[in-house]
């Protein structure tokens, strides 16, 4: 597979790994108060699910529509059985397809998508972890060791919190933004046709202090969503854990090759894309054994829905 997704135009790729829509309904609104957190997309630029849903339709590397009217026009001629256009007009009308209604209908469409993404189809909580929490299952010794490391020496829970708080379910994220020192992904450069620097939150806020920071993702169903990180630079959960464990221990890869170096993730790590704002306070030299890395991966796989 590729580290980023191809849109409707063959050969045209996005520049970030697609985040999951599952459990996105629990992401709080984007806020600057009390520490920057929340919002949709990797950089938080959409305040909520409806705002996020309005983006891909007009993105030239995703759905490649040029106007809101073009999108609503496609809904009007939709061939879905049962008369989708009639249903849309009932929900978003009156006169949802009239030219003067385009903006209202476009927003209504996005709110409908957001409502769908808020249903239990997108937040079933049917993982082994949930079954253990409910007393209906038990972890294996390896999985339990992984959880103990996750909340202890591996320091994963420092950001991927295991306490939902306020009656919220456990989502394994603080919804904040971090720069963990990831390298650029030159495979993405090959797909999009040009090198670039992804400023993340700093680009959205036009604030150099936030350059290279991306929203901390939840870990529900994380075993189903490789590759990993905002640019897909890490190919497996094992490689993710190994990066956190050895980022500051392994030597740097050949700078001419970056993550294309054959030793990437094994004998070296490529240099961070944006080192100036990198968080080096609690990761990079965790001194975990190979077996302990495997245990953390085993625990994270218990977060997959339908595994019980």
Predicted regions and their residues:
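Post-cleavage N-terminal segment of exported redox proteins
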Residues: 60, 69-144, 148, 161-172, ...
């Amino acid at each position: 597979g590729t580290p980023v997704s191809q849109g409707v135009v063959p050969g045209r790729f996005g520049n970030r790994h697609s985040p999951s829509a599952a459990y996105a309904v629990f992401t709080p609104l984007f806020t600057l108060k009390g520490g920057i957190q929340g919002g949709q997309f990797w950089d938080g630029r959409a305040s909520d699910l409806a705002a996020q849903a309005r983006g891909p339709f007009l993105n030239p590397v995703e759905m490649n529509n040029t106007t809101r009217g073009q999108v609503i026009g496609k809904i009007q001629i939709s061939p879905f059985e049962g008369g989708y256009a009639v249903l849309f007009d009932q929900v978003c009308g009156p006169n949802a397809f009239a030219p003067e209604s385009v903006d209202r209908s476009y927003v209504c469409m996005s709110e409908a998508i957001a409502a769908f993404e808020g249903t239990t189809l997108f937040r079933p909580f049917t993982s082994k972890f949930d079954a253990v929490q409910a007393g209906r299952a038990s972890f294996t010794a390896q999985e339990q060791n992984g959880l103990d490391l996750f909340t202890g020496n591996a320091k994963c829970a420092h950001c991927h919190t295991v306490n939902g708080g306020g009656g919220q379910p456990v989502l394994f994220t603080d919804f904040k933004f971090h720069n963990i020192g990831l390298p650029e992904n030159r495979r993405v450069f090959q797909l999009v046709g040009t090198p670039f620097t992804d400023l993340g939150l700093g680009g959205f806020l036009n604030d150099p202090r936030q350059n290279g920071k991306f929203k901390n993702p939840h870990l529900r169903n994380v075993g189903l969503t490789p590759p990993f990180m905002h640019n897909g630079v890490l190919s497996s959960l094992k490689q993710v854990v190994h990066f956190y464990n050895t980022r500051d221990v392994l030597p740097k890869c050949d700078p001419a090759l970056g993550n294309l170096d054959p030793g990437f993730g094994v004998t070296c790590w490529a240099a961070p894309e944006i080192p100036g704002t990198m968080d080096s306070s609690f990761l990079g030299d965790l001194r975990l054994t190979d077996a302990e890395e495997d245990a953390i991966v085993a625990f994270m796989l218990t977060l997959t829905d339908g595994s019980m």
